């Protein structure tokens, strides 16, 4: 399954898909590594995303978000996600 994210500073829209089939949509508060620390982003993922995601086996993550234009900011998002989805191929842009 793939986890797609469209994130701005105020909200993040997540979609879980399996092939061409949409499995579910999840909405959380926004994430922006220019304005939030890795710890703040991690708390949002842990408290907002993971409880709604359940045990779904995520193989790929594509995170497209505000503030993800520079390598150091991309790394913040990638590191938070990689710590929680250890087997997933992660792309941040």
Give, region by region, the residue ranges found by the protein language model.
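Intrinsic-disorder/low-complexity peptide segments enriched for small residues
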Residues: 1-2, 51
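Short glycine-rich, Thr/Ser-proximal phosphate-binding strand/loop in the N-terminal lobe
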Residues: 2-43, 57
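Alpha-helix initiation/capping motif
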Residues: 28-30, 46, 70, 86
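Glycine-rich, highly charged phosphate/nucleotide-binding loops
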Residues: 41-51
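Short beta-strand-loop/turn "lid" adjacent to the catalytic site in phosphate-handling enzymes
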Residues: 52-91
């Amino acid at each position: 399954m793939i986890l797609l994210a469209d994130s701005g500073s105020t909200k993040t829209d997540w979609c879980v898909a399996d092939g061409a089939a949409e499995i579910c949509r999840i909405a959380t508060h926004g994430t922006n590594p220019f304005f939030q620390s890795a710890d703040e982003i991690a708390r949002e993922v842990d408290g907002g995303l993971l409880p709604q995601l359940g045990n779904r086996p995520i193989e790929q993550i594509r995170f497209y978000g505000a503030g993800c234009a520079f390598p150091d900011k991309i790394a913040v998002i990638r590191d938070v996600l990689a710590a929680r989805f250890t087997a997933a191929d992660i792309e941040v842009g």
